[in-house]
Amino acid sequence: MSVSLSSCSSPSVKNPLLLCADSLMETYPDSALSILESITYPQKMPRADRALYALLLTQARHKNYIALEDDSLIKTAVDYYGDKKKSLRAAKAHYYWGATYSEMGYTSFAVEEYLTAIRLMPVRDEFLAMIYDNLAECYERDELFDIAIGAYRQAYQILRGGSQQIYPLRGIARMCLLQNKKDSALVYYQQALDCALVEQDSSLIGALYHDLAMAYSEKKDYIQADKYVSKAIMIQGQDAVNVCLSKAQIMLNLNKLDSASYFYSKNVDQLDIYGKAVYYDGMYQIAKKRGEWKTATENIDAYKILYDSIQFITDNEELNRLMDKHQLEEHKRLLSEHTKMLIS
């Protein structure tokens, strides 16, 4: 999804480097970033130029997958463009403020800024759809699946009929699956797959085959699940860690123990703590079915250790979520004080 700022470039911005970076942003974000980073003493620019510089630099970093570690830069753009009058730049400023908060783990504040960005959008286009998509991800993160699916549907209504509709369709399908609406999930995943096949997007095709395998597994239709996970492996290869774990679990459910053992062990050195927990639990199930009690005990003991670690991580994440609102209010207060100091 791509929207250029150049279509609404302010006549007050004359800096040729800013205008050049703006024109390159969607097609060559790495070049845009290089240009922006070459600008010396941006603080000496006129206020309009500083605001555009802050917006473009945040955008370029985000597009180049550079972490947005604080909001001091984008706040310059937010303060300049405001939140009263509809404009693409104002919407973009609040969107990237939301993206910054999202990366910092402040989901509640990210939602607030995404909603502001939606309100400020002057047109219904791909950028608005992207805001809805990111808003949906925040709701999904907080397990507000009913609200998340509404945001995904808004994105889909904008993108319907185009190649980008794959993303909200996949989001809708995932929300249906999380709400135990398995048949609806299958319908939306199939729609997304049909679109990906038309576009011949191999990475999305492989991902959607995997999605369908998981949906059929939830329905306990392991024959269909195996059909789709095998297709995913054909596209993504046996180095695809999560796909191989899914294949192993499906093989276990089909009681094909040798195949299950092979796929559980395929990429064991690459597994994170969650993957290793799945691995040890699966190997325990296999050993138990074979009557190999010593091996079963070793695997279940390893699984329990990992489970305790995962539970500790989960408890901390829940604590962070409970603290989130308090932290954000404090952060907002400090920002307000900082702004007052700059004005006075």
Model-derived segments and spans:
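N-terminal leader/linker segments that initiate helical-solenoid repeat arrays
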Residues: 8-71, 75, 88
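Structural signature of alpha-solenoid helical repeat junctions
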Residues: 12, 47-52, 69, 89, ...
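Hydrophobic positions within repeat-based interaction scaffolds
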Residues: 13-26, 30-33, 41, 68-71, ...
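"A position-specific structural signal for the A-helix of alpha-solenoid helical repeats
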Residues: 19, 56, 89, 96, ...
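Amphipathic alpha-helical segments of tetratricopeptide repeats
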Residues: 37-42, 75-82, 115-120, 153-157, ...
